Amino acid sequence: MRRIGIIGVLVLGLTGCTSPEKMEFVETGGEEIETSEWIGTLVEDVPKGTESLSDAVVHQITLQYKDGSERRLATKDVIYEAKVGDIGLIAIGHPNQMPSFGVYHYSRDGEWIMRGMKHFGIVGVSEKTQHGLALPQDSMYIIDSEIDDSERPVKLWTLYDETQLVTILMTDAFSVGDGEPINQNADGAERYRLNQPSGNGLYYISQDKLILVTGNVSEEELLTLVDSLPDPSSESFPFHNSK
């Protein structure tokens, strides 16, 4: 089985890598828990015939730590798992690095193919913000990424804190048959509920863009967040301001 070693990957969007986050300590209610420092990621091929997105990422990703140990991801740590059309999006907690997470973006053409990943955590990140959105919490950390795929460019924004994580994905609209209609937005865009094995998710199409919103929060909280999003054509999308 082919293994690709990516040392210090923070973002992988088919190309490029950057320095890893250092997460030697995790704050948990005032108690410091020492953890190994993550230094890289091994990416293996997804076994042919893999149907489940969670099985795909668990088979594919191994985290490497400074002390020489390796940890595979586990399906029990999946935070959300969403599929719309041929797009797959999954978030999973990282072993031995809590609270630390990974968001993995896949596409499927017969088999699951990873298009990008983002690793992030709580330690050392900037302050929580709100950006004029109706968030599940008063404010949350925000991290974004962009996958410059010639076939279908994708932008992602993940809003998170110690326990909750919501990702907003925007890409060019395409014909989709997934989901159950929920209601219409003021602009007439129909929202569709996704049947997810983990977390809740919905999507809608507006101004020639498909917007997917998914996370480990209630559907009501997702709908409230979606109601607060600006138009996809807004330069600041998904935010109302830059601060």
PLM region descriptions:
Residues Q60, I79-E81, I87-P95, G121-S206:
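Short, solvent-exposed recognition patches
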Residues G102-V123, E219-L229:
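Repeat-associated, polar segments at repeat-unit boundaries in modular proteins
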Residues G68-R115, G199-Y203:
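Exposed beta-strand-loop-beta-strand "reactive/processing" segments of non-cytosolic proteins
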Residues M1-I4:
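Positively charged n-region of N-terminal signal peptides that target proteins for export
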Residues G13-G16:
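C-terminal motif of bacterial Sec signal peptides marking the signal peptidase cleavage site
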Residues L210-K243:
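Surface-exposed amphipathic alpha-helical segments
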Residues I6-V11:
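Hydrophobic helical h-region of N-terminal Sec-dependent signal peptides
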Residues T18-I79, D86-A91, G116-M117, G121-I143, ...:
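N-terminal, intrinsically disordered, polar/charged segments of Gram-positive cell-envelope systems
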